[in-house]
Amino acid sequence: MKKKFLAFAFIVVGTLTVGTYAQRNVTPAIDRDPLMEADAKHNLDVAWQSYSLKKAYKGVLSRFEETYAAYPEFSKIDEFLYLAGVSSYLLSENKGKQKVDLKLEKEKDKFTPAKLRENAVAYLSRLVDKYPESKYKDEARKTLALLKDEK
């Protein structure tokens, strides 16, 4: 009787263990640093304000580069890639309130129209390729099409 009870107990425990094993999270969640995430979120908010309210596209690019260099795993990096790509495109068209001064050495290397278009294609292509679920993907494709038509 004891042997049957022990065998039954092992079967029950084994069955329950297999069920919980099957339910475990197969893809581990990305461990995000809360301080870095908060800082990156702040930079994203400032970039949105610079983009939409001030039309300060150089400021958007500055915030993006700072954030991407420090924290490329940011949970909303797709949004930042979109902002950086569109800002690069608009700057290459000489739009916005911050104008590019190609007489300055610092801006000459970084903000030539060809370099800005190249960066816009890189940022937007990365968004489309790496983040297919992003809500910015369709707008990124439209801007990429505009960039390819201009070549």
Where are the predicted features?
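Acidic, polar-rich low-complexity tracts and alpha-helical solenoid repeat scaffolds
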Residues: 2-8, 18-151
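Repetitive helical segments and hydrophobic/amphipathic motifs
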Residues: 11-13
